[in-house]
Amino acid sequence: MDTYSGQNGWADTSNASPWGDTNDTMPIDNSLSNSLSGLQLNEDINTVRANLTESIWGTERTGAPNNVETGLEAKDSLNVSTNFNELNTAILSPTSSTSNIEEQNSFTESLESWINEVRKTYNPQQLDIISIEEIPEREGLLFKHANYSVKHLIDLPNTEPPKNRTVVRRYSDFLWLQEVLLKRYPFRMIPDLPPKKIGSQNLDPVFLNKRRIGLSKFINLVMKHPKLSKDDLVLTFLTVPTDLTSWRKQVSYDTADEFTDKRISKDFVKIWKKDLAEIWNNTANCIDELIDKWTKISILVDRHEKRLQIIANERKIMNDLIHDVGNLTKSVYPIDQNPTILDINSGMTVISKHIEKTNENYNQQALDTKQKVLPKFRMYTDILRALKNVFERYKMLATNNVSMLQKHIDLNLQKLEDMKGKPDASGQEYDRIKTTIRKDRKIMYEQSNRAWLIRECILEEFTIFQETQFMITGCFQEWAKVQSTYSSLNLNEWENVTNHILEMPLSRE
């Protein structure tokens, strides 16, 4: 994980596929093996891209030999006839017995209950609880940098809030936090950071404001995440009043990933269903297109906001011109000869007021679109990208060599079998091979356990991601609300001005 660099996610250079052919292996005991009877894992959907030696989504799952414990240490006794392939079909062979059907129904209910509980932990549409403002004074001797006032609006758990619940942070502090989260939670939806600068734009006020908004989105997405929001370093970032760079030099902190010293739950293995992997495959195959389409929608909403500003500016120019025309008509149409010009000028005054009022509406509509509508559209894009990055990091980090270890174990077991009955066989060599087998089995268990933990983690992320579907509704509801509000206001203005214009004279009669 320490090989990760940059702030824009993992490079999309790997040809490894998270959905490739797998022999997802987890040594388990007989009781767990029996409970998995009839459970089929997912068949490969994207074999063209598959080249991982081992993946967490698979067509089948190999098990540990009957003489291997589920702990990290294998038993001392070695049955040469036993190998890791023996349980491939045994633990996955389906039966049609009534008890098994009832058991599978129970697993399905357990899965639904698990999913419901996980989904309750996440609400991406909840109000932001962190506000970020740029501090006007810039620091630095040669290279000036911006500081940000980071304020949490509610009390955070197990922390002592600083004065006014506010701390001062730099962009580099946010970058450090993201890197730490990526190391600790490589398969969680870690949001992207805005760029530090683009060319010479690091002093441009428009760019700085966009970066501030991006930092605010980042930290608020982190705080809405059920797992990330409870991380001790996240809470430290938000509450330690001292300079974070100095704090990092004075203390030691752990960046090991969340799977360290953790074992997969037997309950999760029981509720696993192949349909889940098929859904993930479909998501991985279309996530890029969804991001592309939604980004284009967001761009069109943004362009509409820009057009509203252009319309407002043009109408202001039109209003000034109408005022000038009213002044000039008094000279062109002498009042003593054309008393109707007074009524016409009076009508143009009404038109001018109408333009001023509709101008206010256009400006306010543009502002509401910018502050209320666009952030919702862009927030959804950020979460989609975060999910995509989970898939990309999986390609980079979720590989293992379980299949190679299994072949190595089989080879050594055969060596032990061949050494039987040979008087010239070395006892020391025999013991060395036995020790190697134990070590390989231990590593195989650890890697298989990690593969299942990754599967559970990504299922949690994909499950909470399902709550983001309601963000689509929220986006268009806010968009329609703004459109409807100002369309009604402008319609009223047009009706009023039309009534006045109809009273303007069309002839001398």
From Swiss-Prot:
Gene3D superfamilies: Arfaptin homology (AH) domain/BAR domain (1.20.1270.60), Phox-like domain (3.30.1520.10). Keywords: Cytoplasm, Membrane, Protein transport, Transport. Belongs to the sorting nexin family. SMART domains: PX. The PX domain binds phosphatidylinositol 3-phosphate which is necessary for peripheral membrane localization. One of its GO terms (biological process) is plasma membrane tubulation. The gene is MVP1. It comes from the Eukaryota. Required for vacuolar protein sorting. This is Sorting nexin MVP1. It is found in: Cytoplasm; Membrane. It comes from Candida glabrata (strain ATCC 2001 / BCRC 20586 / JCM 3761 / NBRC 0622 / NRRL Y-65 / CBS 138) (Yeast).
